[in-house]
Amino acid sequence: MALTKAQMKKIVLSFAGANESTSYGYPSFKIEKKFFTRLRAEDNSLVLMVSSIDERDMLLEAEPKLFHITEHYRNYPTVLARLEKLDAKTLRGFLERRWRQIAPKKLQREYLAQDK
């Protein structure tokens, strides 16, 4: 099921430490001061960081209706996800992995302690 911008924003901001910010002059979301994601207004796609260019290429091949890239992102481990094709579970999965990579360890410990 397609996500609205409001639903996407609610999911992104549900991660501990997430806040609205800017990246290179564009509205974005960060965990503390580290880039988390952003919505590209040009094509209504969410910028998602992945572990490698190989992973990105696999995603592009496996789900071309959902994932794409532009020339700007060709040399980066980044994939663009079309918001109208993206579901909440998939988005949470990508964001959780990214959050674990960039959130300070103290924040991660505090967040995980709340789940117990």
Language-model features: where?
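Charge-dense, helix-prone N-terminal extensions
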Residues: 1-116
